[in-house]
């Protein structure tokens, strides 16, 4: 199908530069697949014919041999149809969006923890407004202990425990007002910056 059209004299198919760009995109996709854990890989719509090549690429550690194996994997991936490769790309993008949301949730919890340590009862009142089911006494005790540990240069056990309690609190299902409170906190901190 490639070559010149006999009637018009124009080239058919993609240019060599376009073919090179597509090959590099597939090579990069192969690198991303090799970097995934087996559990993450199982969630993706990867054809069974590619799994052994991906596993072999993971096994090889020598730099040049690993690169050669990735090129071999890319060669097999180019044989797959575009719909399959697009489905893999879409699934990888969805996974990265999920990971980004999880990281954002952790950052929100960290901001709450820092606010509790810096502002004390003012931040605690806002947190309890957002999460009415939260245990005020436990949170206040953890904040006090974390401040005390920081002042005495002790290991941050209460600091970590406060994070765990806040994370568990933010992950409880059915706390719609709590989620709104965290979102309000996130947007307020972004507006301050």
Curated annotation (Swiss-Prot):
Q: Name one GO biological process term.
A: assembly of large subunit precursor of preribosome
Composition-biased stretches (Acidic residues): 181-193
rRNA-binding as UniProt keyword: yes
Please name the source species. Answer: Xanthomonas campestris pv. campestris (strain ATCC 33913 / DSM 3586 / NCPPB 528 / LMG 568 / P 25)
Family affiliation: Belongs to the DarP family.
What one GO molecular function would you report for this record? rRNA binding
The record's region (Disordered) falls at 1-20, 170-193
Give start-end positions of Basic and acidic residues composition bias.
Answer: 1-10
A GO CC annotation given for this chain: cytosol
- Keywords linked to the UniProt accession: Cytoplasm, Ribosome biogenesis, RNA-binding, rRNA-binding
Residues annotated as signal peptide:
none
Which Pfam families does the annotation name? DarP
Q: What does this protein do?
A: Member of a network of 50S ribosomal subunit biogenesis factors which assembles along the 30S-50S interface, preventing incorrect 23S rRNA structures from forming. Promotes peptidyl transferase center (PTC) maturation.
Q: What is this protein called?
A: Dual-action ribosomal maturation protein DarP
| Superkingdom, taxonomy of origin | Bacteria
Q: Where in the cell is it found?
A: Cytoplasm
């Amino acid at each position: 199908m490639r070559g010149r059209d006999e009637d018009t004299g124009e080239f058919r198919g993609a240019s060599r530069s376009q073919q090179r760009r597509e090959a590099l995109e597939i090579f990069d996709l192969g690198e991303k697949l090799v970097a995934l854990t087996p559990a993450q890989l199982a969630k993706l719509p990867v054809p069974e014919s590619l799994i052994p090549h991906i596993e072999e690429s993971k096994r090889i550690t020598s730099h040049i041999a690993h690169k050669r194996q990735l090129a071999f994997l890319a060669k097999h991936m180019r044989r797959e149809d575009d719909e399959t490769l697009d489905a893999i790309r879409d699934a990888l993008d969805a996974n990265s969006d999920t990971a980004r949301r999880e990281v954002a949730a952790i950052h929100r919890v960290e901001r709450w923890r820092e606010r509790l340590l810096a502002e004390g009862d003012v931040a605690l009142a806002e947190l309890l407004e957002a999460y009415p089911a939260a245990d005020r006494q436990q949170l206040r005790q953890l904040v006090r202990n974390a401040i005390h540990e920081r002042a005495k240069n002790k290991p941050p056990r209460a600091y970590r425990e406060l994070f765990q309690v806040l994370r568990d609190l933010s992950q409880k299902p059915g706390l719609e007002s709590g989620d709104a409170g965290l979102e309000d906190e996130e947007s307020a901190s972004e507006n301050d910056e």
